[in-house]
């Protein structure tokens, strides 16, 4: 039963000041770069372009740096600069800036009206490492000193809470048969709900049934007999969605396909209303359960389904510290209307932002030395920094560069600083819009297996990841291994979706077969950070 309205609410916001010294550093840095360019323009360059650059140098405070990290690769850093909506500077709104590296020589280039103006950075006092650090970590919003602070999450549903013996849940005899012979659960491994060995679940893609399966299997959730028929109806409806997604001619750009899925998901809303009163949370469940991200905001998602998942998981986390929910690229960037992003260009009133904004990116288990995260963490040896999606952590920022606890804390802090930005909530409402660079970078980051293994071995940990995984095995081996879990099943042709899970068996030792086979996503064969493309959502 719901305890409040679901749609049409607006969070009230307040503002807090950011670090003025950091802002001053960024402003001076940008001003100096433009100064070098302005001084280097020759007489053969048009006076209009020269005047433009001169005005930028003199009036830098009228500029807003929309997003520093648009693309970071081995040889190029690109970012856009946008005017403060002032008529005087409107001619500059199309300016693009790049820092290029050629044979260890760095050049700053500005493109205006299809012409490039540049200068070398090698004879300046600007340190390349500081350039990378600033461009990679800073975002200045509409008001550079304002950060949005939204209200805390308000529960939507009343959830029954009880004390169960695991045997009372009757997973094997009553619940598991509901999921049997369904494609989406064909790769799920058995879980021992009486064990304290941790379990991990990969992408669930907005499937309510997948989240329920994870909670049933680990003993965190039970269901009354009256709810079994509604559970069956829920799974049948989500099978319908899967069948549409698996059609050879399915195209997310076609309104007919999108509207078909939206119509099916609207029927699911009614079933969820009927099912919810018969679900019972087991407050004494002992099996740790970690969701690795992309639980919501994906192809099985609509607002009601995502709110159902978020509300249930938050309630369980509030009473059982064994459950952890991590942020992936989808719940972070998509507001629950994933499919409707393709049929509209204005945000809807409904949003899941308040429910996901406090999700961490990483969770480190010191007992088993496991770093759970969605993307996988790598280490850039040349620049001495850790990379996870759009977030980097320089070793200079750490007290102990090999401490996984400290690393996870810094990563989570940086992630929350970004998604609490004043502009971010708006950008996630329509993720395919070009200003949502966080979505682009976090989606396209698909590191190679070797890079993940090297980072794990350096830190002396294991990593359990999702996103680019192609399915894991039940056991994880010695320190330094990686287990990849994902809802995308690379072993089958077409767009086969299935959920993957694992339960750690720490005494097993390394397997003969690598837990994560050497599967490399086609988008990332040429480098660590692929070029960011427009309409990234169509390429997931």
Swiss-Prot record:
Pfam families recorded: DUF4049 (PF13258)
Superkingdom of origin organism: Bacteria
Entry's Gene Ontology BP terms? inositol catabolic process
InterPro entries in the record: DUF4049 (IPR025123), Metallo-depent_PP-like (IPR029052)
Q: Know the name of this protein?
A: Uncharacterized protein YhiJ
Name its species.
Escherichia coli (strain K12)
Query: Which lineage is the organism of this entry classified under, starting from the top rank?
Result: Bacteria, Pseudomonadati, Pseudomonadota, Gammaproteobacteria, Enterobacterales
């Amino acid at each position: 039963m719901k305890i409040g309205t679901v749609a049409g609410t607006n969070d009230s916001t307040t503002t807090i000041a950011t670090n003025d010294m950091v802002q001053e550093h960024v402003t001076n840095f940008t001003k100096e770069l433009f100064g070098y360019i302005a001084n280097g323009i020759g007489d053969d360059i048009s006076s209009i372009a020269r005047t433009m650059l001169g005005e930028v140098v003199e009036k830098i405070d009228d500029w807003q740096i929309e997003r520093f990290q648009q693309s970071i690769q081995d040889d190029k850093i690109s970012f856009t600069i946008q005017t403060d909506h002032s008529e005087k500077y409107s001619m500059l709104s199309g300016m693009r800036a790049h820092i290029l590296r050629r044979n260890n020589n760095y050049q700053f280039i500005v493109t205006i009206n299809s012409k490039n103006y540049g200068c070398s950075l090698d004879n300046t006092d600007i340190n390349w490492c500081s350039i990378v650090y600033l461009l990679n970590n800073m975002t200045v919003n509409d008001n550079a000193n304002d950060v949005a602070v939204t209200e805390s999450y308000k529960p939507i549903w009343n959830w029954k809470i009880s004390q169960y013996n695991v045997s009372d849940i009757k997973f094997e005899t009553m619940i598991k048969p509901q999921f049997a012979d369904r494609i989406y659960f064909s790769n799920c491994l058995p879980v021992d709900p009486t064990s304290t060995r941790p379990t991990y679940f990969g992408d669930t893609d907005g499937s309510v049934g997948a989240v329920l399966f994870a909670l049933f299997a680990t003993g965190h959730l039970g269901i009354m007999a009256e709810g079994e028929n509604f559970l069956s109806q829920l799974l049948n409806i989500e099978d319908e969605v899967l069948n549409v997604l698996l059609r050879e001619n399915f195209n997310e750009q076609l309104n007919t396909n999108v509207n078909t899925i939206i119509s099916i998901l609207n029927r699911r809303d009614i079933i969820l209303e009927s099912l919810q009163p018969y679900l019972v949370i087991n407050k004494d469940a002992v099996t740790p359960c970690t969701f690795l991200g992309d639980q919501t905001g994906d192809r099985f998602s609509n607002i009601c389904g995502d709110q159902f998942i978020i509300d249930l998981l938050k309630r369980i986390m509030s009473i059982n510290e064994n459950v952890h929910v991590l942020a992936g690229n989808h719940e972070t960037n998509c507001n629950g209307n994933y499919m409707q992003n393709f049929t509209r260009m204005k945000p809807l009133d409904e949003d899941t932002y308040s429910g996901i904004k406090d999700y961490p990116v990483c969770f480190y288990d010191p007992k088993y030395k496991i770093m759970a995260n969605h993307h996988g963490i790598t280490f850039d040896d040349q620049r001495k920094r850790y990379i996870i999606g759009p977030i980097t952590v320089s070793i200079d920022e750490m007290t102990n560069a090999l401490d996984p606890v400290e690393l996870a804390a810094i990563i989570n802090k940086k992630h929350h600083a970004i998604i609490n930005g004043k502009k971010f909530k708006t950008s996630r409402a329509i993720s395919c819009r070009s200003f949502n660079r966080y979505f682009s970078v976090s989606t396209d980051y698909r590191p190679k297996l070797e890079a993940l293994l090297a980072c794990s071995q350096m830190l002396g940990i294991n990593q359990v990841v999702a996103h680019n995984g192609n399915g894991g095995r039940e056991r994880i081996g010695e320190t330094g291994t990686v287990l990849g879990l994902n809802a995308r099943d690379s072993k089958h042709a077409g767009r086969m979706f299935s959920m993957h899970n694992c339960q750690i068996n720490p005494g097993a030792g390394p397997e003969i077969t690598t837990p994560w086979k050497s599967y490399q996503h086609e988008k990332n064969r040429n480098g660590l950070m692929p070029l960011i493309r427009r309409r990234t959502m169509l390429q997931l």
